From Swiss-Prot:
Carbon 2 of the heme B porphyrin ring is defined according to the Fischer nomenclature. Its EC number is 2.5.1.141. The keyword Nucleus does not apply. GO terms for biological process: heme O biosynthetic process. It comes from Parafrankia sp. (strain EAN1pec). This is Protoheme IX farnesyltransferase. It is an enzyme of class 2 (transferase).
Amino acid sequence: MAAPAAGAEPSSDPLVVPRGRLARATDRARSYIALMKLRVVELLLVSTVPVMLLAERGMPSWWLIAVTLLAGTLSAGSANTINCYVDRDIDQLMGRTKRRPLVREVVEPAQALRFGIALGIISTLMFGLLVNWTSAVLSVGAIAFYVFVYTLGLKRRSPSNIVIGGAAGCFPVLIGWSAVTGTVGWPAVLLFAVVFFWTPPHFWALAIRFKDDYAAAGVPMLPVVATLEVVTRRILAYSYLMVAVSLAVAPVADIGLVYLVPAVLLGAWFVAEAHRMAARAKRGEEIKPMRLFHMSITYLTLLFAALAAAALL
């Protein structure tokens, strides 16, 4: 079919969507998805499936895995969207966040808030009706903790913001366990602690890199209010705690060398990098914080992959 001539009347066919309208709709959908911060959600969900495998001591039903992941994505997306709504004033001051939809005004603040609340309601109903109500309660707790304790409470007030507030990112571990068992067991509690102690090194490394952004926005992240030597010592301390708890998972969860050997090797690798950072900071040398940031993602991914392997073997 030949293309219509320039200046021709647009089609009256109701099934044909004008290109401009389609492009605007696509951009709008992308903006709402961007509010959910799916790249962050992806990291959170890395821990969910391995914990489900451990709780089941095998492979749970694909239906349960799919529903849990979808509901978990919507739950985390709800918390992230509301976070974007609350932080829209400081996001415009930070180079890392100034392209977010609310800063660019491609989504109205009220619409973003309604979207975030709707995601939370849908995820809660999905967990409650399709998984179990224990998981639903944990999901609501995660959203509430992230929004009220971290975003509204600690983020702009305390250098310990990410230490305490980061607990919200640990809830997928508990939800993964409860989705299978309907309860929260000790292995899940220890894995929660692994992610809890992992969070400060992960985010402080990022905050070192974007220290000026946080300072401009008035967010008292530890690298803004403390010396680099102090920050790297804290990173090292939390790294040791993280590794110690990760090793304690093996006897408590009754899993063997398939998990323990990788946990030891990964832990040694991570602690060695944390030591390197602390030593270079003490000498006043460049520390390359993003190296630890990316290593932390690899560490957590491989640790939970080892957990999944141990659960299946």
